[in-house]
Structure formats: C-alpha cells, structure tokens
Amino acid sequence: MDYENIDDEAALFGVLADPTRLKLLRLLAQQREPNALCVNALACRLGVTQSAVSQHLRVLKSAGLVKGERRGYRIHYFINQETLMQAQQQISSALRLEERISDGNSQEK
C-alpha cells in the first residue's frame, strides 16, 4: 500500500481501527524477526480463534504491515518494519500539516 495520499492514509486508519489487529501488531512488534509467531501462538496469546487471527493477519498483510514466512508446515508472522516506518512518517507529516493549517486559521481571527 502506498501511503502518499489521503485515501491511503484513511485506509491505513481503517486497518488500525480494529482492537484485535492492534493487539496483533503489538504482539508481533515485541518479537524479533527470527522469533516470529504462528497463527496458533497468536490465537492462544490473544484468546481468540485461529480463524479470527488468520482473517486479521490477512488484512494486515494486504496493508503491508505484516509479513509471513513459511517454516515447515506453518507460516510465522512478523512486522514489516519498512512499511510501518513509511506509514508512521506519512501520518506524522499529515498531522504536522494539520497543525500548520490550524495555526494559520487562528492567526486570521
């Protein structure tokens, strides 16, 4: 996903709007790439079904926030640092722009 415009930023916020997906990202962020977690481990830690975890991972993966790597017969997931940093920069940039607009409006009054 390319986070260069407002529609992409809105899509990112939509992906992050689900509490389970945020919990998944936090769990995965605590891991290092070699210590990625499989669906079963994530489901156990979150107390949700493997099916629910798989669906949420699919959304996170399609947004580019998570990567999967096959290890044996399981896929282990980890944070995609590059995309996460890009998304963070885009959000920060958008928020700074909003601050400048707000400052300009308050000066006009």
Report the location of each language-model feature.
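Alpha-helical residues within the helix-turn-helix
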Residues: 44, 55, 61-62
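Histidine-centered divalent metal-coordination motifs
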Residues: 21, 55-56
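Intrinsic low-complexity/disordered segments
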Residues: 47, 52-53, 85, 104
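N-terminal helix-turn-helix DNA-binding core of bacterial DNA-binding proteins
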Residues: 7-49, 71-83
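Divalent metal-coordination and catalytic microenvironments
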Residues: 53, 60, 77
